[in-house]
């Protein structure tokens, strides 16, 4: 049979094909008939109609003509609904524009692009109520008071009121919420900062005889000390530390970089680069030398990694990091870097030993430690690099271990010894806030946070604040405090996880915190050398995040920068004044053929090491330093915060206290033991011929001065005025003996070859070598401002009432009468 001749059968289905038909059919199967289905459906519709009628009838009654209140309420509701839902399109457009400008800010490569996008976003964003975030009325009243005082024109009133009431956080104007998402500082705060800066410049630039230079400088020092300092803190984070480059670069470009910079781990690398370079060198480094930041070496094969871990206990070899740091910082010490740039560098390290506390290395606590050694120790994270020994410069400039080696087991008597080693400071003190507060009077911190275990938590905290409001932000802060509290409890109880608890028990944030928005790709390469593209990406992230904080930084640091500018200008004027006085004195002495009137400016405290290292000078050091300061100030903007260059070379360059001669040490002991009566100090007249002791005055010399006077009394009559000189030389082996005369003190320099020989008299008068005895004050930092003010007071008394006499020189010695009004024990 042929298959093609078979009849085709169409497909068929049982039951209705539509959904409604199937539903009815299904319902009929469970009902007795269609009439029963219609009755059930009618009852269901009637039930819901009655319920709807009972619900709607009260609202319908409002439309009755005899119920005007109901009609008014209904019209109000309808108007509100129309207003609410007719603006949906407009609000959607505004949200789209805000999103667009935010994306522009996230991808901006220059500050101009970012500022334009931020300005447009600020227009699209509803304005906040600023009076809820700070005391606007207090700032306005203070601004009016300052303007009224300036219009009166009394500089002393301005100085008096500003010295009494000048604080950083006036009316909570440093509130971080106030500056969040803002391009500019709020108007009233900006006007207040500008007014204070204007009045500070008025005091600084005043030429009236009402205020002396010393008085203005003292006022600026005291006000700055009371106002406080700002420090920049850079956290750890391995290769994520390239984020700090963008932060520092932005602060440098806007001239907001603080003078105090501290960090740990990779943050210490960026701090070392910044603290060892001038402004032009910093800008050149950011533009051309980013590729030199190679933190890690090549891991190599599996066997080399296993061998390194078994022998050194570390994954990477630290020699690559040491070579990079040597190229970046040379062999500079903390003191030399401070003398060269004026910036204070702080690096934190901690010890593997259980009972040794962490340290913050700086030019005060460890002046001669080599910077590259401190940075490598601060980067030695356990398992990544082995712990390192600190290196320092000795008296001859050689690189030696900072700590002497000690016996590992003295009870057994073994001869093996090892030096003290240090490791990553972020393990215990990632942000050394407490140390900087104690040493440098810091009360405001700018923190760049890139730690992989902290940055995500801070980003989450910002998201909670942005989407949850203030109450949610307070809850997030409460959770943070609870975590830190539990970690501190773990540390107190001494549980085995104490090392992990230390990471979370530290301070994470500062007054202004810049948090890195790291991606998963960046976290995956955290212990690898970043490529040039990755470095640029991280640096751009740092720049954009810092641009968002510029408003807060300008508001918090504006007055501080104005104080720094004024102090820098006044210090420059004082250096010029002293140079002119020395030049005029030298010219007058050479013209009249008389000995110069050299002064020794002794204060009521022992001078610091940086000031007293002068005995081996040839007399031209002051002039060289003054010329260098003039050239340096002419080549850069005086408005930066680090123009306070020192007046003397550091002790590491001129020999320092470790290279003092025996005679210089004797002279220092003599200055410390002087005990001059206050009547004698005030009794000196301005004329060189006036008597040393006023009528009715008393003088009580110290036992050391009495002994010195009795020793040299036989030789004092043979000393006469010698040839014209401006200074004397004290060399190794010479003896410096004091003597009180009728018009001051005589300092007899007895030559080494004449010790033990009788006085010959005035046979061969030689011309002594030229060296200056006056010691210009090295500009003090904020930790010694009060002592510096005492020096300034002594200088003023010296100018007003001291008597200056001439210098004489002979074979047996040379006399230097010194004003008694400036030597006070």
Curated annotation (Swiss-Prot):
<dbReference type="Pfam" id="PF01734">
    <property type="entry name" value="Patatin"/>
</dbReference>
<feature type="active site" description="Proton acceptor">
    <location>
        <position position="424"/>
    </location>
</feature>
<keyword id="KW-0551">Lipid droplet</keyword>
<feature type="compositionally biased region" description="Polar residues">
    <location>
        <begin position="632"/>
        <end position="653"/>
    </location>
</feature>
<feature type="region of interest" description="Disordered">
    <location>
        <begin position="632"/>
        <end position="655"/>
    </location>
</feature>
<dbReference type="GO" id="GO:0016020">
    <property type="term" value="C:membrane"/>
</dbReference>
<feature type="glycosylation site" description="N-linked (GlcNAc...) asparagine">
    <location>
        <position position="129"/>
    </location>
</feature>
<feature type="compositionally biased region" description="Polar residues">
    <location>
        <begin position="801"/>
        <end position="812"/>
    </location>
</feature>
<keyword id="KW-0443">Lipid metabolism</keyword>
<feature type="compositionally biased region" description="Acidic residues">
    <location>
        <begin position="788"/>
        <end position="797"/>
    </location>
</feature>
<feature type="region of interest" description="Disordered">
    <location>
        <begin position="776"/>
        <end position="825"/>
    </location>
</feature>
<feature type="compositionally biased region" description="Low complexity">
    <location>
        <begin position="714"/>
        <end position="726"/>
    </location>
</feature>
<feature type="glycosylation site" description="N-linked (GlcNAc...) asparagine">
    <location>
        <position position="800"/>
    </location>
</feature>
<comment type="function">
    <text>Involved in the release of fatty acids from the oil body in germinating seedlings. Can hydrolyze triacylglycerols and diacylglycerols but not monoacylglycerols, phospholipids, galactolipids or cholesterol esters. SDP1 lipase activity is required to limit triacylglycerol accumulation in roots, leaves and stems, which are vegetative tissues. Functions synergistically with PDAT1 in regulating fatty acid flow from membrane lipid synthesis toward peroxisomal beta-oxidation through a transient triacylglycerol pool.</text>
</comment>
<dbReference type="GO" id="GO:0019433">
    <property type="term" value="P:triglyceride catabolic process"/>
</dbReference>
<dbReference type="GO" id="GO:0006071">
    <property type="term" value="P:glycerol metabolic process"/>
</dbReference>
<comment type="similarity">
    <text>Belongs to the PLPL family.</text>
</comment>
<dbReference type="GO" id="GO:0012511">
    <property type="term" value="C:monolayer-surrounded lipid storage body"/>
</dbReference>
<feature type="region of interest" description="Disordered">
    <location>
        <begin position="686"/>
        <end position="726"/>
    </location>
</feature>
<keyword id="KW-0319">Glycerol metabolism</keyword>
<feature type="glycosylation site" description="N-linked (GlcNAc...) asparagine">
    <location>
        <position position="616"/>
    </location>
</feature>
<feature type="glycosylation site" description="N-linked (GlcNAc...) asparagine">
    <location>
        <position position="331"/>
    </location>
</feature>
<dbReference type="InterPro" id="IPR016035">
    <property type="entry name" value="Acyl_Trfase/lysoPLipase"/>
</dbReference>
<protein>
    <recommendedName>
        <fullName>Triacylglycerol lipase SDP1</fullName>
        <ecNumber>3.1.1.3</ecNumber>
    </recommendedName>
</protein>
<keyword id="KW-0378">Hydrolase</keyword>
<feature type="domain" description="PNPLA">
    <location>
        <begin position="232"/>
        <end position="437"/>
    </location>
</feature>
<dbReference type="GO" id="GO:0004806">
    <property type="term" value="F:triacylglycerol lipase activity"/>
</dbReference>
<dbReference type="Pfam" id="PF11815">
    <property type="entry name" value="DUF3336"/>
</dbReference>
<dbReference type="GO" id="GO:0005777">
    <property type="term" value="C:peroxisome"/>
</dbReference>
<dbReference type="InterPro" id="IPR050301">
    <property type="entry name" value="NTE"/>
</dbReference>
<feature type="short sequence motif" description="GXSXG">
    <location>
        <begin position="263"/>
        <end position="267"/>
    </location>
</feature>
<dbReference type="InterPro" id="IPR002641">
    <property type="entry name" value="PNPLA_dom"/>
</dbReference>
<dbReference type="GO" id="GO:0006641">
    <property type="term" value="P:triglyceride metabolic process"/>
</dbReference>
<feature type="glycosylation site" description="N-linked (GlcNAc...) asparagine">
    <location>
        <position position="637"/>
    </location>
</feature>
<feature type="glycosylation site" description="N-linked (GlcNAc...) asparagine">
    <location>
        <position position="601"/>
    </location>
</feature>
<keyword id="KW-0472">Membrane</keyword>
<feature type="glycosylation site" description="N-linked (GlcNAc...) asparagine">
    <location>
        <position position="327"/>
    </location>
</feature>
<keyword id="KW-0325">Glycoprotein</keyword>
<dbReference type="InterPro" id="IPR021771">
    <property type="entry name" value="Triacylglycerol_lipase_N"/>
</dbReference>
<feature type="active site" description="Nucleophile">
    <location>
        <position position="265"/>
    </location>
</feature>
<keyword id="KW-0576">Peroxisome</keyword>
<keyword id="KW-0442">Lipid degradation</keyword>
């Amino acid at each position: 049979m042929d298959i093609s001749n078979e009849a085709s059968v169409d497909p068929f289905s049982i039951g209705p094909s539509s959904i409604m038909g199937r539903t009815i059919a299904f319902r009929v199967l469970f009902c007795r008939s269609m009439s029963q289905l219609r009755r059930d459906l009618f009852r269901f519709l009637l039930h819901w109609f009655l319920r709807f009628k009972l619900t709607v009838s009260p609202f319908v009654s409002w439309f009755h003509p005899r119920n005007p209140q109901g009609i008014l309420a209904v019209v109000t509701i309808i108007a509100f609904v129309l207003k609410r839902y007719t603006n949906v399109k407009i609000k959607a457009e505004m949200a789209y524009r805000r999103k667009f400008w935010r994306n522009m800010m996230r991808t901006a490569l220059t500050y101009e692009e970012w500022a334009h996008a931020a300005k447009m976003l600020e227009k699209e964003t509803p304005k906040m109520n600023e009076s809820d975030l700070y005391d606007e009325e207090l700032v306005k009243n203070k601004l009016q008071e300052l303007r009224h005082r300036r219009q009166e024109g009394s500089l002393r009133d301005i100085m008096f009121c500003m010295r009494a009431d000048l604080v950083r956080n006036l009316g909570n104007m440093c509130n971080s919420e106030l500056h969040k998402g803002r391009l500019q500082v709020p108007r009233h705060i900006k006007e207040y900062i500008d007014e204070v800066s204007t009045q500070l410049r008025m005091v600084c630039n005043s030429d009236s005889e009402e205020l002396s230079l010393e008085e203005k400088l003292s006022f600026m020092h005291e006000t700055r000390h009371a106002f406080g300092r700002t420090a920049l803190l850079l956290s750890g984070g391995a290769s994520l530390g390239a984020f700090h480059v963008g932060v520092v670069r932005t602060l440098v470009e806007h001239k907001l970089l603080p003078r105090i910079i501290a960090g740990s781990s990779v943050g210490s690398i960026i701090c070392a680069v910044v603290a060892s370079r001038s402004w032009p060198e910093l800008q050149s480094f950011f533009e051309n030398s980013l590729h030199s930041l190679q933190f890690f070496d090549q891991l190599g094969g599996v066997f080399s990694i296993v061998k390194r871990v078994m022998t050194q206990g570390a994954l990477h070899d630290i020699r690559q990091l040491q070579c990079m740091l040597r190229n970046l910082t040379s062999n500079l010490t903390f003191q030399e870097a401070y003398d060269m740039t004026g910036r204070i560098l702080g690096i934190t390290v901690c010890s593997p030993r259980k009972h040794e506390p962490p340290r913050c290395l700086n030019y005060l606590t460890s002046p001669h430690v080599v910077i590259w050694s401190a940075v490598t120790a601060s980067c030695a994270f356990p398992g990544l690099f082995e712990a390192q020994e600190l290196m320092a410069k000795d008296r001859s400039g050689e690189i030696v271990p900072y700590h002497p080696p000690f016996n590992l087991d003295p009870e057994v008597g073994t001869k093996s010894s090892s030096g003290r080693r240090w490791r990553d400071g972020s393990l215990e003190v990632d942000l050394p806030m407490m140390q900087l507060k104690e040493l440098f009077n810091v009360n405001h911190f700018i923190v760049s946070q890139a730690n992989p275990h902290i940055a995500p938590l801070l980003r989450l905290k910002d998201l909670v604040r942005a989407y949850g409001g203030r109450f949610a932000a307070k809850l997030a802060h409460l959770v943070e405090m609870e975590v830190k509290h539990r970690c501190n409890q773990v540390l107190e109880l001494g549980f085995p996880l104490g090392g992990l608890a230390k990471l979370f028990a530290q301070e994470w944030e500062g007054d202004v915190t810049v948090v890195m928005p790291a991606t998963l790709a960046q976290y995956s390469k955290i212990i690898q050398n970043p490529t040039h593209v990755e470095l640029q990406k991280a640096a751009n992230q740092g720049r954009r995040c810092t641009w968002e904080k510029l408003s807060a930084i300008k508001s918090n640091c504006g007055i501080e920068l104005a104080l720094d500018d004024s102090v820098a200008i006044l210090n420059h004027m004082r250096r010029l004044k002293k140079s002119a006085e020395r030049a005029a004195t030298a010219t007058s002495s050479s013209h009249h053929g008389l000995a110069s009137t050299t002064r020794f400016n002794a204060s009521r405290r022992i001078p610091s090491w940086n000031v007293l290292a002068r005995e081996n000078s040839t007399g031209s050091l002051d002039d060289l330093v003054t010329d260098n300061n003039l050239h340096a100030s002419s080549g850069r903007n005086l408005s930066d915060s680090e123009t306070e260059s020192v007046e003397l070379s550091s002790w590491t360059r001129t020999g320092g206290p470790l290279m003092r001669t025996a005679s210089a040490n004797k002279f220092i002991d003599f200055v410390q033991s002087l005990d001059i009566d206050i009547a004698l100090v005030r009794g000196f007249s301005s004329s060189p011929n006036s008597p040393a002791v006023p009528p009715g005055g008393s003088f009580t010399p110290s036992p050391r001065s009495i002994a010195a006077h009795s020793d040299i009394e036989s030789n004092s009559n043979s000393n006469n005025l010698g040839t014209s000189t401006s200074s004397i030389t004290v060399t190794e082996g010479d003896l410096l003996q004091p003597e009180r005369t009728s018009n001051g003190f005589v300092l007899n320099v007895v030559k080494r070859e004449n010790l033990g020989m009788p006085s010959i008299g005035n046979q061969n008068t030689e011309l002594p070598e030229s060296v200056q005895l006056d010691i210009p004050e090295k500009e003090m930092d904020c930790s010694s401002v009060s002592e510096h003010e005492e020096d300034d007071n002594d200088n003023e008394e010296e100018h007003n009432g001291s008597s200056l006499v001439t210098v004489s020189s002979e074979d047996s010695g040379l006399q230097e009468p010194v004003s008694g009004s400036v030597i006070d024990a």
